[in-house]
């Protein structure tokens, strides 16, 4: 049955307008994004198939063009639309971090980092460069690596901090395994970065590890 034949209160678009986006399931939200289904399959049914295929909304959003286009009804146009939505969300969160002391918006920091790093199939190491008032100067992807690790070089991080005239930094990296628990190597690296940056008067405020369902803060753990 086409969505247009459903009772009005059950149609995703009308439901969103009446009750707000938070009232919709992942499949219903995705159906609004898709707009139409394919022959014999409604947009909601197609959305459910996509979520089942990828396993989660996070993995769907992190899919490559090749992975995305393998499925019926999907292609470069839909992929481009999805990437545009993701990028707009990231930029909106990044704007929040530039407007004041980043330490006053810990949840915004977590949201931004999750959106940027969660679901990536390889490890990515990110640095947020801050001014003396802890306002964001720029966020950079400093290093990336394999499924299990990224090689991080403190000397290169110091160079970037000096280039941006940063007074403080926040680091983050993802664990493609989905487990956010910091490793011993993560702790050693964080201390190495902290010591190297201290030599040029740059303070390390935190280091976040991003998993599939959890974010661990080194500062909250007392590891900074």
Curated annotation (Swiss-Prot):
Keywords (alphabetical) are: Hydrolase, Metal-binding, Metalloprotease, Protease, Zinc
Q: Where is the MPN domain?
A: 102-224
**UniProt KW Disulfide bond keyword:** no
What InterPro entries does the record tag this protein with? MPN, RadC_JAB, RuvA_2-like, UPF0758, UPF0758_CS, UPF0758_N
- A Pfam family: RadC
Positions annotated to bind Zn(2+)? 173, 175, 186
Gene Ontology molecular function terms on file: metal ion binding; metallopeptidase activity
In chain numbering, motif JAMM motif lies across 173-186
A GO BP entry is: proteolysis
Question: Would you identify the family this protein belongs to, as annotated?
Answer: Belongs to the UPF0758 family.
This protein is called what? UPF0758 protein NE1464
